[in-house]
Amino acid sequence: MSRSTITYQPALDGLRAVAVTVVLFFHARLGWMQGGYLGVSVFFTLSGFLITSLLLAEHAATGTVKASAFYTRRARRLLPASLVCLSLVCVLAAAGAFDGITKLRRDVLGAVFQVFNWVKLGSGETYADITAAQAGLRRPLDHYWSLAIEEQFYWVWPLVFLGLLAWCRRRRTTPLFTVGVLVAVFSVAAPVIAMVWGPDAAYWASPARIA
């Protein structure tokens, strides 16, 4: 199997459309869409599926995964729009468009270094804070929290993927068994994080989201 065998799947675009719609309805503060924030989890799941499919296809075709090429492709896809948005926000902030410039500087750094979700967790902010009325005018970069989690996944997962393949070869363990163990471990990660560090940690923290 090669990269070219991964054909376009319209059903995935349909899921994306549904996820976008419910998130937009949620942020529009429609009373009947209180669970719309779960659309973000759909995006994370789709990203994990697609990225893993690409890695599996590349490994099947070439016998390895070129992490540097993977990172380059992800950067070309994500960074241009992200940096344009950051630059525009900085220009508008310099013109006095936003309040709380100190916090905005912190948020810009969190977005640039792809740790925005950890910035939010460390500041003690909740998801309710970024969905409050007029929050977008006070914190124009809050949407970077989900992008940061995706970017962290993109950095880590190819290396973990290669490590798992090497482990399976050395131990003569089937990949399916190894994946099953990982699923079992991660299935309890989010509840444990929520129990020990609270529900906000389960929402912001990357390990809980990967789970």
What role is predicted for each listed range?
Residues M1-A211:
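Membrane-interface helix/loop caps of multi-pass membrane proteins
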